[in-house]
Amino acid sequence: SYTNADYYVYSDPKFILKIGKKNLNLIDLYQKFNASQASFLTAYNPMSQEMTFEQNESMNNKLETLLVKMNSPFILAEGVCPESQFPGEKSFLVFGTELLIAKELGNKFQQNAVLWINKDAIPQLILLK
């Protein structure tokens, strides 16, 4: 489930985000990227339907290209759910993303949910479906 998942952020140092738990590493990154909000996004396994590695990589590359076009700074990340049959989902921690934009990107890539984090550095699960 989304709430039990570990959301790895591959910064230096790397750290794990948990829904509902404040993360001080995130505050440091907010300062670095001059941001006060962020989102955790993936294009893997749309509508929770398991896709092949190649399909997932292709969709995630499209998301990455879009983030670059939007000039949205991001760090590579990965969502891992301990009780899921899915392998980890490559993701992006994207800085400066307003909630509406995070939802739009999640919907564009047919995700059931996204994580959104405001200035309090507490990740929130935002259900889209």
Tell where the protein language model's regions lie, with residue ranges.
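N-terminal, charge-rich interaction modules
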Residues: S1-T65
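Short amphipathic beta-strand/extended segments with alternating polar/hydrophobic composition
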Residues: K18-G20, E104-L105, I126-K129
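Short, flexible, glycine/charge-rich loop motifs used to bind or transfer phosphoryl groups or to couple energy/partner
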Residues: L29, P82, E104
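A generic "folded-domain core" signal
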Residues: N56-E57, I117-I122, K129
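Amphipathic protein-protein interaction modules
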Residues: E57-I101
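Mature, function-bearing regions of proteins
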Residues: T65-V68, P123-K129
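Short, compact, well-ordered microdomains
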Residues: F86-S91, F95-Q124
